[in-house]
Amino acid sequence: MAKANVRVRKKVKKNIAEGIAHVHASFNNTIITITDRQGNALSWATSGGAGFKGSRKSTPFAAQVAAEAAGKAAQECGVKNLEVRIKGPGPGRESAVRALNAVGFKITSISDVTPVPHNGCRPPKKRRI
C-alpha cells in the first residue's frame, strides 16, 4: 500500500509582548490559560494535566506546577508582561499567581473576576461529612 504524503506544518512562532493569564480555581481543579489581548489562547495547563489525580488536583502545589507549565509555554511565544484574572474560590488562587511571578513574568495587575449571582440559581446543599 502506498504511503500517503503527510505535510507537516511548521509551528508559527508568535511574538506577543503582553498577555492575560486566566486562573480558574475551582474546588476540584485549577485551570490556567494564557491568552493575548484579543483572547486567543497561547498556552494552557491544568492541575490534572500536570499529573495530579483525585483530591491532589485541588492542592495549591498542583496549581503551582500547572502555572509553571503554562508560563513556560507562554514565554516561548514571547510573553513578558501579564495581567492576571482570577476566577473561583479554590485553594490554588494565590499559589498560581506566585508561580507565574516566579517564572519571570512582570505582573501588571491582578483582578478578581469571580461571578457573583444577583440571587440566581439555588446553591448546592450543605455537605455532611
UniProtKB/Swiss-Prot annotation:
InterPro entries in the cross-refs: Ribosomal_uS11 (IPR001971), Ribosomal_uS11_bac-type (IPR019981), Ribosomal_uS11_CS (IPR018102), Ribosomal_uS11_sf (IPR036967)
Annotated GO MF terms: rRNA binding; structural constituent of ribosome
Entry keyword Mitochondrion: no
One Pfam short name: Ribosomal_S11
Keyword RNA-binding: yes
GO biological process, one term: translation
One Gene Ontology cellular component annotation held by this UniProt entry: ribonucleoprotein complex
Keywords tagged on the record: Ribonucleoprotein, Ribosomal protein, RNA-binding, rRNA-binding
Role this protein plays: Located on the platform of the 30S subunit, it bridges several disparate RNA helices of the 16S rRNA. Forms part of the Shine-Dalgarno cleft in the 70S ribosome.
Family classification: Belongs to the universal ribosomal protein uS11 family.
Subunit structure: Part of the 30S ribosomal subunit. Interacts with proteins S7 and S18. Binds to IF-3.
Protein name listed in UniProt: Small ribosomal subunit protein uS11
Native species: Methylobacillus flagellatus (strain ATCC 51484 / DSM 6875 / VKM B-1610 / KT)
